[in-house]
UniProtKB/Swiss-Prot annotation:
Protein name, entry field: Basic phospholipase A2 13
Tissue: Expressed by the venom gland.
Physiological role: Snake venom phospholipase A2 (PLA2) that inhibits neuromuscular transmission by blocking acetylcholine release from the nerve termini. PLA2 catalyzes the calcium-dependent hydrolysis of the 2-acyl groups in 3-sn-phosphoglycerides.
A Gene Ontology BP annotation from the UniProt entry: phospholipid metabolic process
Origin organism lineage: Eukaryota, Metazoa, Chordata, Craniata, Vertebrata
Keywords, sorted A to Z: Calcium, Hydrolase, Lipid degradation, Lipid metabolism, Neurotoxin, Presynaptic neurotoxin, Secreted, Toxin
Principal cellular location given in the protein's record: secreted
Subcellular location per the Swiss-Prot or TrEMBL entry: Secreted
Listed EC numbers: 3.1.1.4
UniProt-listed InterPro entries: PLipase_A2_dom_sf
Organism annotation: Bungarus fasciatus (Banded krait)
Length: 31
């Protein structure tokens, strides 16, 4: 179950994670 979740994050969430990091850095820069 945890492995499946991890695999889902690695496959479908990689680009989303990158976008999230960029958004987080953008928000942090203007905080």
């Amino acid at each position: 179950n945890l492995y499946q979740f991890k695999n889902m994050i690695e496959c479908a969430g990689t680009r989303t994670w990158i976008a999230y990091v960029k958004y987080g850095a953008y928000t942090y820069a203007y905080t």
